[in-house]
Swiss-Prot record:
Protein name per its UniProtKB record: Elongation factor Tu
Gene encoding the protein: tuf
Residues noted as binding GTP in the record, renumbered to the chain: 19-26, 83-87, 138-141
Organism annotation: Mycolicibacterium vanbaalenii (strain DSM 7251 / JCM 13017 / BCRC 16820 / KCTC 9966 / NRRL B-24157 / PYR-1)
Keyword set, alphabetical order: Cytoplasm, Elongation factor, GTP-binding, Hydrolase, Magnesium, Metal-binding, Nucleotide-binding, Protein biosynthesis
HAMAP family, per database record: EF_Tu_B
Known partners and oligomeric status: Monomer.
Coiled-coil segments: none
The protein's Enzyme Commission number: 3.6.5.3
Protein's cellular compartments: Cytoplasm
NCBIfam families the UniProt entry points to: EF-Tu, PRK00049.1, PRK12735.1, PRK12736.1, small_GTP
Entry function: GTP hydrolase that promotes the GTP-dependent binding of aminoacyl-tRNA to the A-site of ribosomes during protein biosynthesis.
CDD domains recorded: EF_Tu, EFTU_II, EFTU_III
GO terms for cellular component: cytosol
Length: 396
């Protein structure tokens, strides 16, 4: 029994299982927790299939998603693993970003090969920016014909290549069910899969290593000291006396210097990703800055009005619209801390979008918003969420 040490310094990586319904995503998730528990019992608890399958409901940007989170560790890394059992749940999770992935395990049954949902999941993973996919060829115990397995592997590699994923990614033959039952050969296959995950999914860039960005939630004047903006630092680090820019909503970008950082009324030297802070800004009047703008490291983010997005529209049962919408639909787009009205153009050949659909749209906002590709938003009508999406391409 190997002994792995628990270290907070281990890299933390978010992964998930994706693929066609009934190809064994949830069974594989359970098998991974069991195999790693047996290998490193002091680090991992085993999770039964039905614990994962009865995925708890979560609300993300006003959308309810059934999703399971499990945690486990290998010798090298600490993983948070998400499994969305239903196809619709998977789509909603990918688009709303309830659980962002640094890499994914694509589960393909060796008995079936890639199915329509397999393709859709890989396409969606590409659209929402999952950086890396490797493959678990599941149910491999049920296929005796070596050539058949090779054909399935070739098909899967072509599918990955078609969406610009690594064609040479590891493809590991596993049997999740047999591994759960403790069959030695297939337990090894799951260990092999996790070694491949350790080796092939790159370490994510930590949020603190990215350029500083803080969405403005509130603005105050402190007599004798100046203007303070508050918010939660989204990424990066801000030090006292650093220059920043205020971007978005207004036509012009404003430069200023942060003369103080405070958290819970205490003065700090710096604020970092995840902290709720107040920033004291030099020479800025209260009316120069407003909610919905962002404070950023100069030159790292620009404001835009025109973009393309991948969106999921809530069904009526989820509290969404009862009717479809058409070209020139004008809802509000909620980015970070504020709503901005935008005009929607549907893709060529799409006449309307029904509640419950996912689609690509082009949007023209009436005010510029600081955005990068990958930024998520909610679609709202009078404060009620009717959809969610992600910026896939900036036009202007």
């Amino acid at each position: 029994m190997a002994k792995a040490k628990f270290e907070r310094t281990k890299p933390h990586v978010n992964i998930g299982t994706i693929g066609h319904v009934d190809h064994g995503k949830t069974t594989l998730t359970a098998a991974i927790t069991k195999v790693l528990h047996d290998k490193y019992p002091d680090l991992n608890e085993s999770r039964a299939f039905d614990q994962i399958d009865n995925a708890p409901e979560e609300r993300q940007r006003g959308i309810t998603i059934n999703i399971s989170h499990v945690e486990y560790q290998t010798d090298k890394r600490h993983y948070a693993h998400v499994d969305a059992p239903g196809h619709a749940d998977y789509i909603k999770n990918m688009i709303t970003g309830a659980a962002q992935m640094d890499g994914a395990i694509l589960v393909v049954a060796a008995t079936d090969g890639p199915m329509p949902q397999t393709r859709e999941h890989v396409l969606l993973a590409r659209q929402v920016g999952v950086p890396y996919i490797l493959v678990a060829l599941n149910k491999a115990d049920m296929v005796d014909d070596e050539e058949l397995i090779e054909l399935v592997e070739m098909e899967v590699r072509e599918l990955l290549a078609a969406q610009d994923f690594d064609e040479e990614a590891p493809v590991v033959k596993v049997s999740a069910l047999k591994a759960l039952e403790g069959d030695e050969k297939w337990v090894k296959s799951v260990e092999e899969l996790m070694e491949a995950v350790d080796e092939s999914i790159p370490d994510p860039v930590r949020e603190t290593d990215k350029p500083f960005l803080m969405p403005v939630e509130d603005v105050f004047t402190i007599t004798g000291r100046g203007t303070v903006v508050t918010g939660r630092v989204e990424r990066g680090i801000i030090n006292v006396n650093e220059e920043v820019e205020i971007v978005g909503i207004r036509p012009d970008t404003t430069k200023t210097t942060v003369t103080g950082v405070e958290m819970f009324r205490k003065l700090l030297d710096q604020g970092q990703a995840g902290d709720n802070v107040g920033l004291l800004l030099r020479g800025i009047k209260r009316e120069d800055v407003e909610r919905g703008q962002v404070v950023v490291k100069p030159g790292t983010t620009t404001p835009h009005t025109d973009f393309e997005g991948s969106v999921y529209i809530l069904s009526k049962d989820e509290g969404g619209r009862h009717t479809p919408f058409f070209n020139n639909y004008r809802p509000q787009f909620y980015f970070r801390t504020t709503d901005v009205t935008g005009v929607v153009t549907l893709p060529e050949g799409t006449e309307m979008v029904m509640p419950g659909d996912n689609t690509d749209i082009s949007v023209k906002l009436i005010q510029p918003v600081a955005m990068d590709e990958g930024l998520r938003f909610a679609i709202r009508e009078g404060g009620r969420t009717v959809g969610a999406g992600r910026v896939t391409k900036i036009i202007k």
